[in-house]
């Protein structure tokens, strides 16, 4: 049965209520986590402060590997925020799934929706163009991004912009959506076959949840890494 959506509109624009609520919940969780981990910080970190400092250093490592060293501080906060948002978004719907009424889903991963992932991808691609123009000016940006090292590659580079958007967004969507679908199939099997499969279904569900969370972490890492790679293509001078 096709999953129903909690739709509402503001003028001519329609929204998925579940996705809106889950995105807001993701933002609240990220903010609360960072707030809790950065209260009463000490010179010698321990506990929650150790976790947040490890995450900050981890993200700094991603940026350092893909951007010039002088640019690390400029994009560190953006990359950290993006990583945390994508990570929490990936995990939310893998921990549990709530369906009420006539197959109406009220709890799912925001990144299991292609509109969310493609919007995130579009946002990052637009930001790469913005920072490229800020660095080189409009004319210099066009020359550096599309006419170097040779001008006849212009059609290929224009196509690359489109493919970068699709691969960045659809890769994330596909992995998270597939994880949720399989979890739903396992739960559906228990409901349709009978309680006697629970001893097999529970360990299988737990294993797949753990694997899906691992995949969610990897996908957050890949999304941020590719975003920084695309950013470096726009703000570094092409030889």
From Swiss-Prot:
Entry-linked InterPro entries: ATP_syn_F0_a_bact/chloroplast (IPR045082), ATP_synth_F0_asu (IPR000568), ATP_synth_F0_asu_AS (IPR023011), F0_ATP_A_sf (IPR035908)
Pfam families with a match to the protein in the record: ATP-synt_A
Source domain of life: Bacteria
Membrane topology: Multi-pass membrane protein
GO MF annotations, alphabetized: proton-transporting ATP synthase activity, rotational mechanism
A cellular component term, taken from the record's GO annotations: plasma membrane
Job description of the protein: Key component of the proton channel; it plays a direct role in the translocation of protons across the membrane.
Family as reported in the entry's similarity comment: Belongs to the ATPase A chain family.
Quaternary organization: F-type ATPases have 2 components, CF(1) - the catalytic core - and CF(0) - the membrane proton channel. CF(1) has five subunits: alpha(3), beta(3), gamma(1), delta(1), epsilon(1). CF(0) has three main subunits: a(1), b(2) and c(9-12). The alpha and beta chains form an alternating ring which encloses part of the gamma chain. CF(1) is attached to CF(0) by a central stalk formed by the gamma and epsilon chains, while a peripheral stalk is formed by the delta and b chains.
Record-given protein name: ATP synthase subunit a
Organism: Enterococcus faecalis (strain ATCC 700802 / V583)
Lineage: Bacteria, Bacillati, Bacillota, Bacilli, Lactobacillales
